[in-house]
């Protein structure tokens, strides 16, 4: 879904923003604190229901306002989100209220590329698992269904473990069965997708880090040779003592292995940034191969990447048919890249929360 129109109300210092005739590349420039990253934040809020900067709605809803609103339109769809300071939200697709955030996310596949961040590599398994599950959600039709049932069973099992001390195997049996059934499905789905993803990943890795050997290695979170049910049975007493479920797909990881060790231990900060970009580009490539258009948020492109890496990234996103919303302090460099690559774009100036069309 490529956006032709974007309206933002009361997100941080953006009181009212109305953008029309959006292009494949949309570049926002201005001083630090002007509000340009808040535009990306608003698009992220629409697609995911949350900000990439804070988990607390009142932190991004304008001071003394009760809500924030984001509306977007493509050639065929209209989607909107009202977020209240309480955290409640109202979502609409083509004028009809929808119940789940997933319905908006399916229409608006979105990737956020922050060249300054190395969280996916340095901050443990959770962000890597989330990265994998973003891909699963968009390319594996049955994933969301299986994940919902697995998550429900995990929540119920953990609640029992936290609230009751003398649990028998019989007490946990219904949840063990559901965890095992749906956990094995999730494992099979993830394993298949990681194998496919690795092919795309190697292509983008070779463009950004041609001298590095890195493999994606999926760690399932349980002992697959004996199966999840056996792990749950074997860990029965220890789970009671821990008060949570130790084994299962919720503990899975996506390991990034080099011939010299794991990426978090052996790569430089600069290499880690390019590795994360390669991971996300390869995911976008997988969606592109299945005729799905991705919206990409690219924050502060020129701050961390050299000119060659900047141009390679812009060119690759254009090849993949992505619609890009990017921020920069150095719009002259970005304009040159876009002109050199003959890419259609719009340039916007952002100053104190006011957004205006600038000369391209």
From Swiss-Prot:
Highest taxon in the source lineage: Bacteria
Keyword vocabulary terms for this entry: ATP-binding, Cytoplasm, DNA damage, DNA repair, DNA replication, DNA-binding, Nucleotide-binding, SOS response
Pfam families: SMC_N
GO molecular function: ATP binding; single-stranded DNA binding
UniProt-annotated location(s): Cytoplasm
UniProt binding sites for ATP: 30-37
Biological process according to GO: DNA replication; DNA synthesis involved in DNA repair; double-strand break repair; SOS response
InterPro entries linked: DNA-binding_RecF, P-loop_NTPase, RecF/RecN/SMC_N, RecF_2
GO CC aspect terms: cytoplasm
Family recorded in the similarity comment: Belongs to the RecF family.
Record function comment: The RecF protein is involved in DNA metabolism; it is required for DNA replication and normal SOS inducibility. RecF binds preferentially to single-stranded, linear DNA. It also seems to bind ATP.
Protein name stated in the entry: DNA replication and repair protein RecF
Species, as recorded: Acinetobacter baumannii (strain ATCC 17978 / DSM 105126 / CIP 53.77 / LMG 1025 / NCDC KC755 / 5377)
Source species taxonomy: Bacteria, Pseudomonadati, Pseudomonadota, Gammaproteobacteria, Moraxellales
């Amino acid at each position: 879904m490529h956006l032709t129109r974007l309206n933002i109300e009361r997100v941080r210092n953006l009181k009212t923003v109305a953008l029309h005739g959006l292009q494949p590349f949309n570049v926002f420039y201005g001083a630090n604190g002007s509000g340009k990253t808040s535009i990306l934040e608003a698009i992220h809020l629409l697609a995911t229901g949350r900000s990439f900067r804070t988990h607390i709605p009142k932190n991004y809803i304008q001071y003394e306002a009760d809500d924030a609103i984001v509306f977007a339109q493509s050639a065929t769809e209209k989607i909107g989100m009202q977020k209240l300071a309480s955290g409640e939200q109202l979502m609409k697709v083509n004028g009809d209220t929808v119940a789940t955030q997933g319905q908006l996310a399916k229409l608006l596949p979105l990737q956020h590329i922050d060249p300054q961040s190395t969280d996916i590599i340095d901050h443990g398994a959770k962000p890597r698992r989330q990265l994998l599950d973003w891909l699963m959600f968009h390319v594996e039709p049955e994933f969301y269904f299986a994940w919902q049932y697995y998550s429900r069973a995990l929540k119920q099992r953990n609640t029992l473990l936290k609230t009751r001390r003398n649990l028998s195997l019989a007490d946990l049996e219904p949840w063990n069965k559901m965890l095992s059934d749906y956990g094995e499905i999730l494992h099979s789905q993830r394993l298949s997708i990681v194998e496919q993803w690795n092919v795309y990943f190697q292509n983008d890795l070779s463009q950004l880090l041609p001298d590095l050997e890195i493999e994606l290695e999926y760690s399932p979170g349980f002992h697959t040779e004996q199966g999840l049910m056996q792990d749950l049975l074997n860990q029965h007493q220890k789970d009671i003592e821990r008060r949570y479920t130790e084994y299962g797909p919720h503990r899975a990881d996506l390991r990034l292995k080099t011939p010299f060790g794991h990426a978090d231990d052996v790569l430089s900060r600069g290499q880690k940034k390019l590795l994360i970009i390669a991971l996300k580009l390869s995911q976008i490539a997988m969606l592109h191969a299945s005729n799905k258009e991705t919206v990409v948020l690219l924050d502060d492109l020129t701050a961390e990447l050299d000119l060659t890496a900047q141009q390679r990234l812009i060119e690759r996103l254009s090849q993949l048919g992505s619609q890009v919303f990017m921020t920069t302090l150095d719009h002259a460099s970005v304009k040159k890249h876009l002109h050199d690559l003959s890419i259609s774009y719009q340039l916007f100036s952002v100053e104190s929360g006011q957004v205006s069309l600038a000369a391209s």
